[in-house]
Protein backbone atom coordinates (compact mmCIF):
# COMPACT_ATOMS: atom_id res chain seq x y z
CA UNK A 1 0.00 0.00 0.00
CA UNK A 2 1.40 3.42 -1.00
CA UNK A 3 1.87 6.47 1.22
CA UNK A 4 -1.35 8.23 0.21
CA UNK A 5 -3.40 5.06 0.59
CA UNK A 6 -1.98 4.55 4.09
CA UNK A 7 -2.76 8.15 5.06
CA UNK A 8 -6.30 7.85 3.73
CA UNK A 9 -6.90 4.51 5.44
CA UNK A 10 -5.51 5.36 8.87
CA UNK A 11 -5.88 9.14 9.19
CA UNK A 12 -8.13 10.90 6.65
CA UNK A 13 -11.22 8.72 6.90
CA UNK A 14 -11.28 8.77 10.68
CA UNK A 15 -10.66 12.51 10.95
CA UNK A 16 -13.46 13.32 8.52
CA UNK A 17 -15.91 11.32 10.62
CA UNK A 18 -14.99 13.43 13.67
CA UNK A 19 -15.06 16.69 11.69
CA UNK A 20 -18.73 16.19 10.91
CA UNK A 21 -19.45 16.47 14.65
CA UNK A 22 -17.02 19.30 15.45
CA UNK A 23 -18.76 22.65 14.99
CA UNK A 24 -15.54 24.67 15.04
CA UNK A 25 -14.01 22.79 12.10
CA UNK A 26 -15.39 24.26 8.89
CA UNK A 27 -12.99 22.32 6.65
CA UNK A 28 -10.59 19.54 7.66
CA UNK A 29 -8.26 17.27 5.68
CA UNK A 30 -8.55 17.41 1.90
CA UNK A 31 -7.61 20.94 0.82
CA UNK A 32 -4.56 23.20 1.00
CA UNK A 33 -5.60 24.52 4.41
CA UNK A 34 -8.02 23.67 7.17
CA UNK A 35 -10.66 26.23 8.13
CA UNK A 36 -11.37 26.73 11.82
CA UNK A 37 -14.33 28.77 13.04
CA UNK A 38 -13.72 30.26 16.47
CA UNK A 39 -16.92 31.41 18.21
CA UNK A 40 -17.41 35.10 18.93
CA UNK A 41 -15.94 35.99 22.30
CA UNK A 42 -13.28 33.26 22.23
CA UNK A 43 -9.60 33.35 21.33
CA UNK A 44 -7.53 30.62 19.66
CA UNK A 45 -4.89 28.86 21.80
CA UNK A 46 -2.11 27.10 19.84
CA UNK A 47 0.72 24.83 21.02
CA UNK A 48 3.30 22.68 19.20
CA UNK A 49 5.55 19.86 20.41
CA UNK A 50 8.03 17.62 18.59
CA UNK A 51 8.90 14.10 19.77
CA UNK A 52 12.07 12.35 18.63
CA UNK A 53 12.87 8.68 19.00
CA UNK A 54 15.71 8.28 21.47
CA UNK A 55 15.11 11.71 23.00
CA UNK A 56 11.44 11.84 23.98
CA UNK A 57 10.56 8.15 23.76
CA UNK A 58 12.55 4.92 23.83
CA UNK A 59 13.15 2.90 20.68
CA UNK A 60 11.20 -0.02 22.09
CA UNK A 61 8.11 2.08 22.93
CA UNK A 62 5.06 0.55 21.29
CA UNK A 63 3.53 2.66 18.49
CA UNK A 64 0.11 2.82 20.18
CA UNK A 65 1.72 4.56 23.16
CA UNK A 66 3.68 6.93 20.88
CA UNK A 67 0.50 8.03 19.13
CA UNK A 68 -1.42 8.36 22.39
CA UNK A 69 1.22 10.32 24.29
CA UNK A 70 2.13 12.63 21.39
CA UNK A 71 -1.36 14.10 21.43
CA UNK A 72 -1.94 13.79 25.18
CA UNK A 73 0.96 16.04 26.14
CA UNK A 74 -0.19 18.72 23.69
CA UNK A 75 -3.68 18.59 25.15
CA UNK A 76 -2.08 19.11 28.54
CA UNK A 77 -0.76 22.47 27.30
CA UNK A 78 -4.29 23.51 26.37
CA UNK A 79 -5.58 22.48 29.80
CA UNK A 80 -2.92 24.60 31.50
CA UNK A 81 -4.13 27.67 29.59
CA UNK A 82 -7.76 26.94 30.42
CA UNK A 83 -8.59 26.11 26.79
CA UNK A 84 -10.94 23.51 25.34
CA UNK A 85 -9.60 21.36 22.44
CA UNK A 86 -10.76 22.05 18.89
CA UNK A 87 -8.36 20.59 16.30
CA UNK A 88 -4.82 19.38 15.69
CA UNK A 89 -2.33 18.79 12.90
CA UNK A 90 0.21 15.98 12.61
CA UNK A 91 3.62 15.95 10.91
CA UNK A 92 4.95 12.39 10.93
CA UNK A 93 8.45 11.38 9.83
CA UNK A 94 8.95 7.63 9.33
CA UNK A 95 12.00 5.60 8.31
CA UNK A 96 9.72 3.44 6.13
CA UNK A 97 6.04 2.88 5.33
CA UNK A 98 5.48 0.18 7.93
CA UNK A 99 1.73 -0.44 7.89
CA UNK A 100 1.74 -2.29 11.21
CA UNK A 101 3.42 0.68 12.90
CA UNK A 102 1.10 3.22 11.27
CA UNK A 103 -2.00 1.21 12.17
CA UNK A 104 -1.07 1.03 15.86
CA UNK A 105 0.19 4.62 15.98
CA UNK A 106 -3.07 5.93 14.52
CA UNK A 107 -5.11 3.74 16.87
CA UNK A 108 -3.33 5.27 19.87
CA UNK A 109 -3.64 8.77 18.43
CA UNK A 110 -7.37 8.53 17.78
CA UNK A 111 -8.08 6.76 21.06
CA UNK A 112 -7.28 9.98 22.88
CA UNK A 113 -8.51 12.27 20.08
CA UNK A 114 -11.94 10.66 20.28
CA UNK A 115 -11.94 10.87 24.07
CA UNK A 116 -11.61 14.64 23.92
CA UNK A 117 -13.52 15.18 20.64
CA UNK A 118 -10.61 16.86 18.88
CA UNK A 119 -10.29 16.70 15.08
CA UNK A 120 -7.23 15.97 12.95
CA UNK A 121 -7.43 18.71 10.29
CA UNK A 122 -4.15 18.41 8.39
CA UNK A 123 -0.49 17.54 8.42
CA UNK A 124 2.35 16.01 6.46
CA UNK A 125 4.38 12.82 6.17
CA UNK A 126 7.97 12.38 5.07
CA UNK A 127 10.75 9.81 5.20
CA UNK A 128 13.52 10.04 7.80
CA UNK A 129 14.32 9.21 11.44
CA UNK A 130 11.16 8.66 13.46
CA UNK A 131 9.67 11.90 14.80
CA UNK A 132 6.22 13.24 15.55
CA UNK A 133 5.21 16.91 15.53
CA UNK A 134 1.72 17.87 16.67
CA UNK A 135 0.11 21.29 16.76
CA UNK A 136 -3.05 21.59 18.84
CA UNK A 137 -5.63 24.35 18.68
CA UNK A 138 -8.12 25.17 21.39
CA UNK A 139 -10.48 27.94 22.40
CA UNK A 140 -10.94 29.91 25.57
CA UNK A 141 -12.98 33.02 26.41
CA UNK A 142 -11.29 36.33 25.59
CA UNK A 143 -9.32 37.73 28.53
CA UNK A 144 -9.66 34.44 30.46
CA UNK A 145 -6.61 32.54 29.20
CA UNK A 146 -4.55 31.46 32.21
CA UNK A 147 -0.91 32.51 31.88
CA UNK A 148 2.27 31.77 33.77
CA UNK A 149 2.71 35.41 34.67
CA UNK A 150 -0.36 35.92 36.86
CA UNK A 151 0.77 34.60 40.27
CA UNK A 152 0.06 37.00 43.14
CA UNK A 153 1.51 37.39 46.63
CA UNK A 154 0.02 34.85 49.07
CA UNK A 155 -1.54 32.74 46.33
CA UNK A 156 -1.90 29.08 47.23
CA UNK A 157 0.27 26.79 45.04
CA UNK A 158 -1.53 23.60 44.00
CA UNK A 159 -0.90 20.55 41.87
CA UNK A 160 -3.64 18.44 40.35
CA UNK A 161 -2.25 14.98 41.11
CA UNK A 162 0.53 12.75 42.40
CA UNK A 163 4.04 13.30 41.04
CA UNK A 164 7.12 11.26 40.20
CA UNK A 165 5.74 7.99 38.86
CA UNK A 166 6.45 8.64 35.19
CA UNK A 167 10.02 9.71 35.96
CA UNK A 168 10.51 6.44 37.80
CA UNK A 169 9.31 4.70 34.64
CA UNK A 170 12.04 6.48 32.67
CA UNK A 171 14.66 5.32 35.19
CA UNK A 172 13.45 1.72 34.91
CA UNK A 173 13.61 1.85 31.11
CA UNK A 174 17.24 2.95 31.36
CA UNK A 175 18.08 0.23 33.90
CA UNK A 176 15.99 -2.79 32.92
CA UNK A 177 17.69 -4.97 35.52
CA UNK A 178 15.39 -3.33 38.09
CA UNK A 179 12.17 -4.25 36.26
CA UNK A 180 12.02 -8.01 36.93
CA UNK A 181 10.03 -8.75 40.05
CA UNK A 182 9.35 -5.04 40.64
CA UNK A 183 5.68 -4.69 41.66
CA UNK A 184 5.67 -0.98 40.77
CA UNK A 185 7.13 -1.11 37.25
CA UNK A 186 3.76 -1.57 35.51
CA UNK A 187 2.32 1.47 37.32
CA UNK A 188 5.35 3.56 36.41
CA UNK A 189 5.29 2.55 32.74
CA UNK A 190 1.57 3.25 32.49
CA UNK A 191 2.07 6.75 33.90
CA UNK A 192 4.97 7.35 31.50
CA UNK A 193 3.32 6.06 28.33
CA UNK A 194 -0.29 7.13 28.88
CA UNK A 195 -0.47 10.54 30.57
CA UNK A 196 -3.91 11.92 31.35
CA UNK A 197 -4.32 15.53 30.16
CA UNK A 198 -6.30 17.30 32.88
CA UNK A 199 -9.07 18.72 30.73
CA UNK A 200 -11.44 17.99 33.61
CA UNK A 201 -9.88 20.91 35.49
CA UNK A 202 -10.56 23.57 32.84
CA UNK A 203 -14.06 24.70 33.91
CA UNK A 204 -13.00 24.76 37.56
CA UNK A 205 -9.85 26.77 36.79
CA UNK A 206 -12.12 29.46 35.37
CA UNK A 207 -14.77 29.11 38.10
CA UNK A 208 -12.25 29.54 40.92
CA UNK A 209 -10.28 32.28 39.17
CA UNK A 210 -6.89 30.56 38.88
CA UNK A 211 -4.24 33.27 38.53
CA UNK A 212 -1.40 31.31 36.92
CA UNK A 213 -0.81 27.79 35.65
CA UNK A 214 1.33 25.47 33.55
CA UNK A 215 1.57 21.74 33.02
CA UNK A 216 4.31 19.74 34.70
CA UNK A 217 6.38 18.30 31.87
CA UNK A 218 9.99 18.95 32.89
CA UNK A 219 9.65 18.43 36.66
CA UNK A 220 7.63 20.25 39.32
CA UNK A 221 10.47 22.49 40.52
CA UNK A 222 11.67 23.44 37.06
CA UNK A 223 8.17 24.22 35.85
CA UNK A 224 7.21 26.11 39.02
CA UNK A 225 10.28 28.26 38.38
CA UNK A 226 8.72 29.31 35.04
CA UNK A 227 5.72 30.67 36.94
CA UNK A 228 7.96 32.42 39.46
CA UNK A 229 10.20 33.93 36.77
CA UNK A 230 7.25 35.11 34.66
CA UNK A 231 5.38 36.50 37.67
CA UNK A 232 8.51 37.91 39.40
CA UNK A 233 7.68 36.05 42.61
CA UNK A 234 9.20 33.49 44.97
CA UNK A 235 7.65 30.46 46.67
CA UNK A 236 7.61 28.39 49.82
CA UNK A 237 7.02 24.66 49.33
CA UNK A 238 5.99 22.35 52.18
CA UNK A 239 7.77 19.06 51.52
CA UNK A 240 5.31 16.84 53.39
CA UNK A 241 2.46 18.13 51.21
CA UNK A 242 4.00 17.04 47.88
CA UNK A 243 1.72 14.23 46.60
CA UNK A 244 3.86 11.19 45.77
CA UNK A 245 2.93 8.64 43.12
CA UNK A 246 1.96 5.17 44.35
CA UNK A 247 4.60 3.81 41.96
CA UNK A 248 7.27 5.24 44.29
CA UNK A 249 6.09 3.82 47.59
CA UNK A 250 8.77 1.08 47.82
CA UNK A 251 11.66 3.52 47.29
CA UNK A 252 13.66 5.36 49.98
CA UNK A 253 12.05 8.66 51.03
CA UNK A 254 14.77 10.84 49.47
CA UNK A 255 14.41 9.06 46.12
CA UNK A 256 10.65 9.48 46.19
CA UNK A 257 11.02 13.21 46.83
CA UNK A 258 13.63 13.62 44.09
CA UNK A 259 11.42 11.93 41.48
CA UNK A 260 8.43 14.04 42.53
CA UNK A 261 10.29 17.36 42.54
CA UNK A 262 12.52 16.93 39.49
CA UNK A 263 11.37 13.96 37.44
CA UNK A 264 8.99 15.36 34.85
CA UNK A 265 6.56 13.68 32.46
CA UNK A 266 3.76 14.01 35.04
CA UNK A 267 1.47 16.23 32.94
CA UNK A 268 -0.44 17.30 36.00
CA UNK A 269 -1.23 21.02 36.33
CA UNK A 270 0.64 23.33 38.70
CA UNK A 271 -1.41 26.45 39.42
CA UNK A 272 -1.94 29.29 41.87
CA UNK A 273 -5.10 30.91 43.20
CA UNK A 274 -6.17 33.02 46.14
CA UNK A 275 -6.74 31.49 49.57
CA UNK A 276 -10.44 32.34 49.31
CA UNK A 277 -10.86 30.61 45.96
CA UNK A 278 -8.82 27.61 47.11
CA UNK A 279 -11.17 27.13 50.07
CA UNK A 280 -14.22 27.40 47.79
CA UNK A 281 -12.69 24.73 45.51
CA UNK A 282 -12.05 22.50 48.53
CA UNK A 283 -15.64 22.92 49.73
CA UNK A 284 -16.93 21.81 46.34
CA UNK A 285 -14.48 18.89 46.27
CA UNK A 286 -15.73 17.67 49.65
CA UNK A 287 -19.30 17.72 48.35
CA UNK A 288 -18.32 15.86 45.15
CA UNK A 289 -18.64 18.87 42.84
CA UNK A 290 -14.97 19.48 41.94
CA UNK A 291 -11.80 17.43 41.28
CA UNK A 292 -9.30 16.82 44.05
CA UNK A 293 -6.30 19.16 44.19
CA UNK A 294 -3.24 19.28 46.44
CA UNK A 295 -2.00 22.35 48.28
CA UNK A 296 1.81 22.31 48.28
CA UNK A 297 2.90 25.84 49.12
CA UNK A 298 2.40 29.56 48.70
CA UNK A 299 3.56 32.46 46.54
CA UNK A 300 5.71 35.10 48.20
CA UNK A 301 7.01 38.53 47.28
CA UNK A 302 10.41 38.33 45.60
CA UNK A 303 12.98 39.80 48.00
CA UNK A 304 16.30 41.32 46.96
CA UNK A 305 18.05 38.63 49.01
CA UNK A 306 16.52 35.84 46.95
CA UNK A 307 17.32 37.63 43.70
CA UNK A 308 20.99 37.82 44.68
CA UNK A 309 21.04 34.11 45.54
CA UNK A 310 19.29 33.20 42.30
CA UNK A 311 16.92 30.99 44.26
CA UNK A 312 13.18 31.57 44.18
CA UNK A 313 12.06 28.47 46.13
CA UNK A 314 12.33 27.86 49.89
CA UNK A 315 11.47 24.43 51.29
CA UNK A 316 9.77 23.96 54.64
CA UNK A 317 8.89 20.99 56.84
CA UNK A 318 6.01 21.65 59.22
CA UNK A 319 6.43 25.35 58.51
CA UNK A 320 10.15 25.50 59.35
CA UNK A 321 12.89 26.12 56.77
CA UNK A 322 14.72 22.98 55.63
CA UNK A 323 18.48 23.02 56.15
CA UNK A 324 19.37 19.75 54.38
CA UNK A 325 20.27 19.68 50.69
CA UNK A 326 17.43 19.07 48.24
CA UNK A 327 18.22 18.33 44.60
CA UNK A 328 16.80 20.95 42.19
CA UNK A 329 17.89 19.54 38.82
CA UNK A 330 14.83 19.31 36.58
CA UNK A 331 14.89 18.25 32.92
CA UNK A 332 16.68 20.51 30.43
CA UNK A 333 15.92 20.42 26.69
CA UNK A 334 19.50 21.27 25.68
Predicted regions and their residues:
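Small-aliphatic-rich amphipathic alpha-helix that forms the alpha element of a beta-alpha
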Residues: 63-87, 104-115, 222-227
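Internal active-site segments that recognize and position negatively charged phosphoryl groups
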Residues: 157, 161, 194-220
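Glycine-rich anion-binding loops of enzyme active sites
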Residues: 10, 51, 84-174, 298
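Short pre-catalytic strand/loop immediately N-terminal to key active-site residues, enriched for Gly-Thr
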Residues: 61-65, 187-195, 211-212, 257-259
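A short, charged helix-loop
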Residues: 176-196, 247
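Glycine-/charge-enriched secondary-structure boundary and capping motifs
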Residues: 2-18, 42, 95-119, 126-130, ...
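Extreme N-terminal cap/leader segments of soluble proteins
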Residues: 1-62, 81, 90, 334
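Residue-level signal for inorganic ion chemistry
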Residues: 35, 74, 82, 120, ...
